[in-house]
Curated annotation (Swiss-Prot):
Gene: rsmE
Free-text function comment from the UniProt entry: Specifically methylates the N3 position of the uracil ring of uridine 1498 (m3U1498) in 16S rRNA. Acts on the fully assembled 30S ribosomal subunit.
Protein localization: Cytoplasm
Assigned EC number: 2.1.1.193
Annotated protein name in UniProt: Ribosomal RNA small subunit methyltransferase E
Cell cycle listed as a keyword: no
Pfam families: Methyltrans_RNA, PUA_4
Gene3D superfamilies with a match to the protein in the record: 3.40.1280.10, Hypothetical PUA domain-like, domain 1
Reactions performed catalytically: uridine(1498) in 16S rRNA + S-adenosyl-L-methionine = N(3)-methyluridine(1498) in 16S rRNA + S-adenosyl-L-homocysteine + H(+)
Organism: Rickettsia conorii (strain ATCC VR-613 / Malish 7)
Matching InterPro entries: Alpha/beta_knot_MTases, PUA-like_sf, RsmE, RsmE_MTase_dom, RsmE_PUA-like, tRNA_m1G_MTases_N
Length: 244
């Protein structure tokens, strides 16, 4: 039997009792899932892993469960970061949802010259990634950082950074640098609708740890470019291991 999953940001251990008192969790279990006392579900987080739980009691504003068995143990892996320019909210939510399903570990909202917006709703994005984490059977939701300018982000980041460049030669694809992907912490940088400015492209090219990549001959929307690049990196690099 396949049990529903719920992300819990608190300590989990076998045979422990957990109280769920948030409005979201109580509504989800009682109203959406319609679970009853003695029904099972799965609780998880990236620190402790995933556990099979049994509902002991359901109150008006809370419910209690007991963790019966550990189903998955936590583990670590290389970091795969998506630094994506801030685009329209519905498109950004789509990109982040898909990125979470594909195993991204960190999300950086980037402020670039041609961004339509300069801030994001972190609370809403967090809800989006938790839902995608629950759905995709991974343990750890991606970390979402505050919006930052592309200039400041490049200054502080020293891992391998791949930036999608529609002006790049088609043969300079991710496949060409696949040997650099193994066991590396990688950042994928995607610009807004309209791409990067010439100054931003020059800035990106000036760093030794950046590589310009082509995603093919077609011009892709920002959200499509992000998903395409992540999928290619996970397929060709060590990041194609089981999603954490």
């Amino acid at each position: 039997m396949k049990y529903n999953r719920i992300y819990i940001n608190s300590r989990l251990a076998e045979n422990s009792k957990i109280e769920l008192a948030s409005d979201h969790h109580v509504h989800y279990v009682k109203t959406v899932l319609r679970l009853k006392v003695n029904d099972g579900l799965r609780l998880f987080n990236g620190t402790d892993g995933e556990f099979l739980a049994q509902i002991n009691d359901i109150g008006k504003n809370n419910l209690s469960v007991r963790l019966k068995e550990q189903l998955k143990k936590p583990y670590t892996k290389s970091t795969l970061t998506l630094a994506v320019a801030i685009i329209k909210q519905d498109k950004l939510m789509l990109a982040i949802n898909m990125a979470t399903q594909l195993g991204i570990t960190k999300i950086i909202p980037l402020i670039t010259r041609w961004c339509q917006f300069r801030s994001v709703n972190i609370e809403r994005l967090t809800k989006c990634v938790i839902e995608a984490t629950e759905q995709s059977e991974r343990l750890t939701p991606p970390i979402i950082e505050k919006a930052i300018t592309i200039q400041d982000y490049l200054k502080k980041n020293n891992n391998l950074m791949l930036y999608a460049n529609e002006h790049e030669k088609e043969e300079n694809s991710i496949l060409r640098i696949s040997s650099s992907l193994s066991n590396s912490d990688i950042t994928i940088i995607v610009g807004p609708e309209g791409g990067f400015t010439n100054d931003e492209l020059e800035l990106l090219a000036s760093y030794k740890n950046t590589k310009s990549i082509s995603l093919g001959s077609n011009i892709l929307r920002a959200e499509t470019a992000a998903i395409t690049a992540i999928a290619q990196v996970r397929l060709l690099g060590s990041h194609c291991e089981e999603i954490a």
